[in-house]
Amino acid sequence: MSSELTPLQRSVLDKYRFLAESLRELSETLSDLNNTHEDSKPEAILQEMREIEVKISLVSTLLKGSVYSLVIQRRMDHQQKPSDL
């Protein structure tokens, strides 16, 4: 049957196979996480998630500040170059 498939059909089937494998791996990972934190209280897990959220927010703010600084610096460099000519 596979010899009757077009290249596009083979490609789609390969992508579905890859997706199925990824979902299986995700399911195993989630199962492992559930078993690992079986003894943890929901409040403790929630507190850990809040701490992670704060850290992610801080990293995001620092990244935005860095990008903004680079944009301003390039804009200033660009404005200075034409005046030097």
From Swiss-Prot:
Q: Name one GO biological process term.
A: mitotic sister chromatid biorientation
Subcellular location per UniProt equals: Nucleus; Cytoplasm, Cytoskeleton, Spindle; Chromosome, Centromere, Kinetochore
Does the keyword Protein transport feature in the UniProt annotation?
no
Record keywords = Cell cycle, Cell division, Centromere, Chromosome, Chromosome partition, Coiled coil, Cytoplasm, Cytoskeleton, Kinetochore, Microtubule, Mitosis, Nucleus
| Coiled-coil segments on the chain, per record | 13-41
Give any Gene Ontology cellular component: mitotic spindle
Annotated GO molecular function terms are:
microtubule plus-end binding
InterPro entries, per the entry: DASH_Dad3
Disulphide-bridged cysteine pairs: none
Q: Family, per the entry?
A: Belongs to the DASH complex DAD3 family.
Q: What does this protein do?
A: Component of the DASH complex that connects microtubules with kinetochores and couples microtubule depolymerisation to chromosome movement; it is involved in retrieving kinetochores to the spindle poles before their re-orientation on the spindle in early mitosis and allows microtubule depolymerization to pull chromosomes apart and resist detachment during anaphase.
Q: Could you describe the subunit structure of this protein? A: Component of the DASH complex consisting of ASK1, DAD1, DAD2, DAD3, DAD4, DAM1, DUO1, HSK3, SPC19 and SPC34, with a stoichiometry of one copy of each subunit per complex. Multiple DASH complexes oligomerize to form a ring that encircles spindle microtubules and organizes the rod-like NDC80 complexes of the outer kinetochore. DASH complex oligomerization strengthens microtubule attachments. On cytoplasmic microtubules, DASH complexes appear to form patches instead of rings.
Name of the protein described by the UniProt record: DASH complex subunit DAD3
